[in-house]
Regions:
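Short loop/turn segments immediately following the C-termini of beta-strands
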Residues: 31-33, 78-80, 124-125, 134, ...
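Blade-level signature of beta-propeller repeat domains, shared across WD40, Kelch, NHL, RCC1
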Residues: 252-292
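Beta-rich, blade/repeat-based domains predominating
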Residues: 10-25, 29-30, 37-38, 56-84, ...
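Hydrophobic alpha-helical segments and helix pairs
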Residues: 86-142
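Glycine/small-residue-rich hydrophobic helix-like segments
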Residues: 178-248
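Short loop/turn segments that connect beta-strands within beta-propeller blades
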Residues: 44-49, 90-95, 133-137, 184-189, ...
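A short beta-strand motif characteristic of beta-propeller blades
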Residues: 2-9, 49-56, 95-101, 138-154, ...
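A short loop-to-beta-strand structural motif that recurs across blades of beta-propeller domains
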Residues: 39-42, 85-88, 128-131, 179-181, ...
C-alpha cells in the first residue's frame, strides 16, 4: 500500500470520488466543505501531476464524477443554490455547464450507460436514482423507494450513495443500510427487480468492480468502519484493508488494471487526506490487494 497523492485537508482537498481515464490519469472530486473551502474537480496524471478542471462555489460540494467516451466529464454538484444543484458536464476543452437541475437533496454517485446516452445519479437524501439524458433535458426518477432510503439508526442518514453501470445493470450502494444492490436495466431502459447482493457492509460509501467482466466488488466503508471490503458475487465479504493500512475515511475505490486506488477523505483528525494505491493479485482467488 502506497500513498499515491497526499492532499491538504485544510485547503479543502478532501477526496470524494475517483474516475480512471483511458490514459490512466484520474479525475478526482474534492469536497471543500469539510474545511469550509470551495470544492474542486482535478485531474491527476500517472506521474502525480495535478491540474484543476473545475473550481466550485464555496458551500457547494462536487460529489460523484464519471466520463463519456468522448472525454466529457459529468459530475454532481450538491448546492443550496437552486441554480447550481444538479448534474453538470465539462466537455473537452469546454466550460462547465449544468445539464439538469435536481431538487433539494444530496446528489452523490453518478454513472453513465455504455451507450453514453443516460446518466444515473444517486440522491442520498431522497432515496432516489435520477435518469438524466446526456443530450440534456429534465431529470426523471428512474428508481426510488425503501431499498434506497437511509436506515434511521445508521451512523449517517444517507441512503443510496455509489452508482455503477455494470453488465446490463445499475449497481448501487446504500450507505446506512449497508447493502449492495443490483437492478437490471430492461430493454425499455426501466428498472427490473431489485436484487440484494450483500447486506452486511456498514457505512458503505462507494465501490468499484475488479474489471468489466467480473462481479467482484471492492467496497469503501467510511467512518467509523474505515475499511475496504471485497464482496463476492455470492454476497460473501472479506475485509481487505483497514486503518492499519493507512485508511482514513475511505470514500471510494477505483481500479486501473491491477492497481486499486482508494480515496481517503481524512474526515477525522489528523485529517490524513490522500489517494492510496495497492496492487491487486489478479491470480489470487480472494482478489486481495497486496500489502507493500
Amino acid at each position: 500500500m502506497k500513498t499515491a497523492v497526499a492532499f491538504d485537508f485544510a485547503s479543502g482537498d478532501s477526496p470524494e470520488n475517483i474516475n480512471v481515464n483511458p490514459d490512466r490519469s484520474l479525475t478526482v472530486s474534492l469536497l471543500g466543505v469539510p474545511a469550509n473551502k470551495p470544492p474542486k474537480l482535478v485531474q491527476i496524471t500517472p506521474s502525480g501531476q495535478r491540474s484543476t478542471l473545475v473550481n466550485g462555489h464555496l458551500g457547494d460540494q462536487i460529489t460523484g464524477n464519471t466520463r463519456g467516451s468522448d472525454g466529457t466529464v459529468y459530475y454532481n454538484v450538491d448546492s443550496d443554490g437552486t441554480a447550481r444543484n444538479g448534474v453538470w458536464k465539462l466537455p473537452p476543452h469546454g466550460r462547465p455547464e449544468r445539464l439538469a437541475a435536481l431538487p433539494d437533496g444530496l446528489p452523490n454517485g453518478i454513472a453513465i450507460d455504455p451507450a453514453g446516452r443516460t446518466l444515473y445519479a444517486a440522491d442520498s437524501y431522497n432515496s432516489t436514482v435520477w435518469a438524466v439524458p446526456t443530450s440534456g433535458g429534465q431529470a426523471k426518477i428512474w428508481l426510488n423507494g425503501p431499498a434506497l432510503a437511509a436506515d434511521p439508526h445508521g451512523s449517517l442518514p444517507l441512503g443510496v450513495n455509489g452508482v455503477r453501470f455494470h453488465k446490463g445493470a445499475v449497481w448501487l450502494s446504500n450507505y446506512s443500510q449497508g447493502k449492495l444492490l443490483r437492478i437490471p436495466v430492461t430493454a425499455h431502459g426501466t428498472p427490473g427487480p431489485i436484487h440484494t447482493v450483500a447486506d452486511n457492509i456498514p457505512d458503505f460509501d462507494d465501490f468499484a468492480f475488479l474489471n468489466n467482466h467480473s462481479d467482484i466488488v471492492f467496497a469503501a466503508q467510511n467512518d467509523p468502519t474505515d475499511r475496504v471490503t471485497v464482496v463476492r458475487p455470492n454476497g460473501t465479504t472479506q475485509v481487505a484493508l483497514t486503518t492499519g493500512d493507512g485508511l482514513a475515511s475511505p470514500t471510494t475505490t477505483a481500479i486501473s488494471g491491477d492497481k486499486l486506488y482508494i480515496a481517503d477523505a481524512g474526515f477525522k483528525a489528523p485529517h490524513d487526506a490522500k489517494l492510496q494505491r495497492a496492487t491487486i493479485n489478479l491470480h489470487a482467488r480472494t482478489g486481495h490487494p497486496r500489502h507493500h
